Amino acid sequence: MTRWALSPEAADDLERLTDFLLASQAEHAFGTVDLVLKALEILADHPKVGRPIGQGLRELVISRGSSGFLALYQYDEAHDIALILRVRHQRELGYPQR
C-alpha cells in the first residue's frame, strides 16, 4: 500500500482554504478539509490515479458540488510514496508560488 504525505506547503494550503471558508461559508469549512483528506486516501491504493501534467507531477481532481479542489502531487515509485505538493480550489488560477 502506497504511503502519502502532505508537504508543508500543502498543509499551509489546507489552512488557507479553511480560513477562506470560515470567512465565507463557515458551515462547510471543516467538512471540506475532511473531504479533501479523505479523497487523498485513494492514493494509498491507486497512486497513479491523478492525471499526469508533466515533469513527473500528477493532479488529483477532488469533486465538491459543482466545483472542487485540485491536489498536485508527485509519486515516487521507488519508495512507493505520494507527496502532496499543493492543494487549491478549482477556480483559483494556478498554484500559489513560494
Task: Please identify what each model-predicted range represents.
Residues R64-R98:
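Enriched for short, Lys/Arg-rich terminal
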Residues M1-R64, E77-A78, Q97:
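Basic, Lys/Arg-enriched alpha-helical interface segments
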